[in-house]
UniProtKB/Swiss-Prot annotation:
GO terms for biological process: defense response to bacterium; defense response to fungus; killing of cells of another organism. Antimicrobial peptide. Has a high antibacterial activity against the Gram-positive bacterium S.aureus (MIC=5-17.30 uM), the methicillin-resistant S.aureus (MRSA) (MIC=17.30 uM), and E.faecalis (MIC=69.23 uM). Has antifungal activity against Candida spp. and one Cryptococcus neoformans strains with MICs values ranging from 6.25 to 100 uM. Also shows an inhibitory activity on C.albicans biofilms at high concentrations. Has a moderate hemolytic potency (18% at 20 uM). Keywords: Amidation, Antibiotic, Antimicrobial, Cytolysis, Fungicide, Hemolysis, Secreted, Signal. It comes from Tityus serrulatus. This is Antimicrobial peptide TsAP-2. Belongs to the non-disulfide-bridged peptide (NDBP) superfamily. Short antimicrobial peptide (group 4) family. Residues 45-73 form a propeptide. Changing residue 36 to K: Important increase of antimicrobial and hemolytic activities.
Amino acid sequence: MQIKHLITIFFLVLIVADHCHAFLGMIPGLIGGLISAFKGRRKREITSQIEQYRNLQKREAELENLLANLPVY
């Protein structure tokens, strides 16, 4: 075999092995995501994020109100 064929096959095997390794590494995360979706954890996380966003908006409005009431120097 010529060297260019060997290099081509080597890179092809390297790419396939890398993709298989990445796929096998993704499987535990996918399983964990499915389990948490079935248990409803994601819904609770979204609810807490909405509350944090509302609190942030409230604090931001209070800060704007405070800055508007400060005298200009």
